[in-house]
């Protein structure tokens, strides 16, 4: 019996071994530029080269995977494609990873006229052909990107694909711009671009391409042949009235295989916000934030060119040198000098659980000056076996603000310096990955706020609040991962150090003596008690040591499914001004993603986070954050825990030009601290109290975009619904606040004829807020509509007419609806382009804006720029 059982087990083992088969996977890349080769056919043949034993196709990252369960000892692997030379390789019949290099061999079709599709797809790469979207009115590539389904471009130049921001912006496969690519979006000439490639689930580290994929896309600009390796430059001058206005721009660029550069200068006082579009990074890093400031008008929901009074100079230098195939150097420098003024009236209405609301009215006038300098130097090696990155950054921001509110004057000054260094070294040996990371950062931010007519004491004529923040951070990381078939096992260890200092002092000056240390301040006894001197100072040091162990396991079936479970455990030792404590912080996460079909993709995620507060949430002494607000925290580091569950579906069909997505997210946060505020006339005191509380968030969104090529029309639409519930304390009463919001947007861009194209965009928002389980205290409906018409006649002449409409239901009278109109005429001949623009033709003097948050209603009446005329002359140097 045992002999039969042994024979059966041997046969079963042999059968299972044969059924399991072997796995052959790897990447295919182009020899010319080492870029991934998408859409390449990868086939397995027997030794006779006739019988096909396996077939696959590379995805957008050039990855492929084949399975073979036969008995042959060796096989023939063949790579074919319409734009590559066929390549064959004899390989052993065993589990292996292959890196295949192919050369291009374009297919030429003679005397054939084919109407090109506007977009196509190969694996994870979606290609948009610029010529199918561009018209005579498009100057920068950002103008064309707005017409491509699935791609959205913000006014700042930030790009999102299918509702998610991109993680890289390439020009001919080279990453020169980094996180500040808005300058390229708004300046690279549309006429120089042949196609735009979107790499879905893009992994920027080549050594991890077939191991770890992301859920973000990257965008790559492919140049026309005549735009490669040549200098393109332009200069523009402009003058206008009313008031006296000027504009000056200079631009130079060159893109080749070994060298890329983009040089810009822009200056104006016409209200063009170059700073947010081309200077400031989209992803603000964890720098020190200002704690003080002057009270200014809130930003209204209209285009900044309509109300921004500025005087700006901005210059940038961006250069990238490719030393060899995978080694490059990036150098960047940016300088900004900006002065902005604003005037208007604001009203803040505070609602309470019981009793009538309190309304605070202010006449605000402000002047804000900024000088900013950013420098970055980076050397990077990015190959399929080795990733090395060494970067050094310097950021300096010098701000000064002068403001008045009635009889109160405010002067704020801050100087921020940030130095950063990043070193990353990652090595791949087969399916095993080793990496070392070391980040260090030093930041310093001294601030001073001078306030006259001090509101918190009748005996004080002037107050001076000083705050100095300083921080040093170091992050060190070791990582090891190994792949076994469909499984990846990864472990990461961190040893982090953080040292933060916060010093503050409030000094006062009365009418009889000079500046001195503040004595106790007296308040309305109904809500306040006297504040002693020692509560007006802070001298804090926060030291942290983190030892983090992050194990992760991943099961990867390729496109159909990938599941990743990570469980970071952070042991944190904190020392606060001599007092030590320790705790564990947990951040587990489970993600399951993949392709349900060739066109439909899914992503499901569950995560839990433990977060500990920073030093700016620790101080217990009062700080005068602006002229009418005193704030303090509990003196204990706040802790927040959160649980989030999300799901997302993405659909794309390049043949029909349809791209869509839908997402749903729920989260709950638990906090051990709550903010309490007391309002006494125009004075506001805010403090943090130790109290357990929680908040809930629920959000659903839908995005869809469709290209109708026969109509030369692109339609983008989105809808977002959100619900939030949280707790606050006001006038010593605990209140549960509920806020619901619905936002919708639709944009249509169409070319009606060879001489007429139009753009329409409409957005609406409905926000209601109030106490939970009660009728909403307020509901705001907001509508914006914009219509643009471009008429081209006799080729060089273009007429541009635009009209814009705003509606806010909480505003009464004639200001409930606001209309703006503009008209411009441009003429182009040879290298010159002349434009004459008339702005704000209907000449509304003010704009009324209302918004709500946490049972507070903010309304402002802001002075607008007057009707004006601007003449510009642009000269193309190459």
List the model feature ranges, each with a label.
Residues 20, 43, 61-65, 85, ...:
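Membrane-proximal, glycine/serine-rich, low-complexity loop/turn segments characteristic
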Residues 27-38:
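Structural motif
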Residues 45-51, 74-90:
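A short, solvent-exposed loop/turn motif at the edges and junctions
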Residues 49-63:
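Short, acidic Ser/Thr/Gly-rich low-complexity loop/linker segments typical of extracellular
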Residues 209-211, 274-280, 341-358, 399-409, ...:
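Outer-membrane beta-barrel translocator domains and adjoining extracellular loop/strand segments
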Residues 324-338, 368-403, 409-577, 588, ...:
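Face-selective signature of the C-terminal outer-membrane beta-barrel domain
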Residues 745-764, 774, 778-878:
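Conserved C-terminal beta-signal and adjacent last beta-strands/turns
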């Amino acid at each position: 019996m045992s002999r039969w059982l042994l024979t059966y087990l041997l046969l079963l083992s042999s059968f299972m071994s044969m059924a399991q088969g072997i796995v052959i996977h790897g990447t295919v890349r182009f020899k010319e530029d080492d870029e991934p080769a998408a859409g390449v056919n990868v086939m397995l043949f027997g030794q006779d080269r006739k019988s096909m034993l396996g077939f696959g196709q590379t995805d957008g990252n050039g990855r492929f995977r084949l399975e073979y369960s036969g008995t042959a000892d060796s096989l023939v692997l063949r790579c074919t494609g319409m734009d590559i030379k066929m390549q064959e390789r004899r390989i052993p019949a065993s589990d292996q990873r292959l890196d295949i290099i192919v050369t291009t061999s374009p297919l030429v079709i003679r005397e054939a006229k084919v109407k090109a599709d506007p977009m196509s797809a190969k694996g994870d790469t979606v290609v948009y052909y610029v010529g199918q979207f561009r018209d005579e009115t498009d100057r920068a590539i950002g103008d064309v990107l707005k017409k491509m389904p699935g791609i959205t471009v913000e006014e700042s130049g930030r790009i999102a694909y299918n509702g998610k921001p991109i993680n890289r912006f390439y020009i001919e496969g080279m990453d020169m711009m980094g996180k500040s690519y808005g300058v390229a979006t708004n300046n690279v000439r549309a006429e120089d671009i042949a196609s735009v490639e979107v790499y879905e689930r893009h992994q920027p580290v080549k050594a991890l391409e077939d191991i770890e994929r992301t859920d973000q896309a990257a965008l790559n600009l492919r140049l026309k042949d005549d735009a490669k390796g040549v200098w393109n430059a332009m200069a523009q001058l402009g003058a206008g009235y009313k008031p006296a206005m000027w504009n000056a721009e200079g631009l130079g660029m060159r893109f080749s295989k070994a060298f890329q550069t983009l040089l810009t200068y822009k200056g104006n006082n016409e209200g063009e916000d170059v700073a947010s579009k081309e200077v400031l990074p989209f992803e603000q890093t964890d720098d020190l934030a200002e704690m003080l400031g002057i009270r200014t008008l809130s930003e209204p929901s209209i285009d900044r060119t309509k109300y921004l009074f500025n005087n700006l100079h901005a210059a940038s230098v961006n250069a990238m040198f490719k030393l060899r195939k995978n080694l490059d150097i990036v150098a960047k420098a940016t300088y900004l000098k900006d002065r902005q003024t604003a005037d208007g009236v604001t009203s803040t209405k505070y609602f309470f659980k019981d009793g009538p609301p309190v309304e605070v009215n202010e006449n605000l006038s402000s002047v804000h000056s900024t000088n900013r300098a950013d420098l970055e130097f980076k050397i990077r090696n990015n190959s399929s076996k080795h990733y090395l990155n060494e970067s050094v950054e310097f950021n300096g921001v010098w701000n000064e603000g002068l403001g008045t509110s009635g009889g109160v004057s405010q002067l704020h000054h801050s100087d921020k310096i940030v130095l950063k260094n990043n070193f990353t070294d990652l090595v791949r040996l087969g399916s095993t990955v080793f990496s070392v990371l070391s980040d260090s950062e030093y930041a310093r931010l001294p601030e001073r706020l001078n306030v006259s007519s001090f509101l918190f004491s009748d005996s004080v004529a002037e107050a001076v609040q000083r705050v100095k923040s300083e921080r040093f951070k170091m992050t060190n990381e070791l990582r090891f991962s190994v792949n076994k078939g469909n499984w990846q096992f990864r472990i990461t260890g961190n040893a982090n150090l953080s040292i933060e200092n916060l010093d503050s002092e409030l000094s006062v000056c009365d009418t009889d003596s000079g500046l001195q240390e503040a004595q106790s301040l007296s308040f309305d006894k109904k809500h306040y008690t006297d504040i002693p001197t020692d509560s007006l100072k802070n001298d804090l040091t926060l030291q942290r040591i983190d030892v983090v162990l992050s194990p992760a396991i991943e099961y990867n079936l390729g496109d159909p499914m990938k599941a990743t479970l990570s469980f970071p455990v952070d042991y944190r030792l904190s020392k606060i001004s001599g007092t030590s404590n320790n705790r564990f912080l947990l951040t587990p996460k489970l993600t399951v993603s993949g392709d349900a079909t060739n066109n439909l993709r899914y992503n499901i995620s569950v995560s839990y986070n433990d977060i500990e507060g920073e030093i700016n949430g620790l101080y217990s002494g009062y700080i005068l954050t602006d002229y009418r607000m005193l704030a303090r925290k509990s003196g204990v580091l706040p802790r927040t825990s959160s649980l989030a569950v999300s799901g997302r579906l993405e659909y794309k069909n390049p043949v029909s030009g349809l791209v869509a997505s839908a997402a749903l997210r729920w989260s709950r946060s638990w906090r051990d601290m709550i903010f309490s505020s007391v309002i006494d006339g125009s004075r506001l005191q805010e403090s943090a109290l130790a109290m357990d509380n929680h908040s809930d968030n629920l959000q659903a969104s839908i995005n869809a975009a469709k290209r109708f090529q026969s109509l030369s029309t692109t339609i983008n639409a989105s809808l977002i619904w959100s619900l939030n519930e949280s707790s606050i304390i006001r006038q010593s009463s605990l209140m549960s606040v509920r806020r619901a919001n619905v936002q919708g947007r639709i944009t249509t861009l169409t070319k009606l004829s060879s001489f007429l194209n139009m753009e329409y965009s409409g957005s609406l928002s409905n926000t209601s807020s109030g106490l939970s389980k009660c009728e909403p205290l307020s509901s705001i409906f907001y509508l914006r509509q914009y219509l643009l018409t471009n008429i081209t006649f006799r080729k060089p002449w273009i007429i541009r007419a635009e009209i814009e409409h705003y509606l806010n239901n909480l505003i009464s009278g004639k200001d409930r609806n606001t209309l703006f109109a503009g008209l411009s005429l441009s003429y182009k001949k040879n290298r010159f382009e002349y434009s004459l623009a008339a702005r704000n033709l209907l000449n509304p003097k003010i704009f009324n804006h209302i918004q709500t948050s946490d049972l507070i209603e903010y309304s402002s009446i802001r002075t607008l720029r007057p009707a004006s005329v601007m003449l510009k002359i642009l000269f193309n140097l190459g």
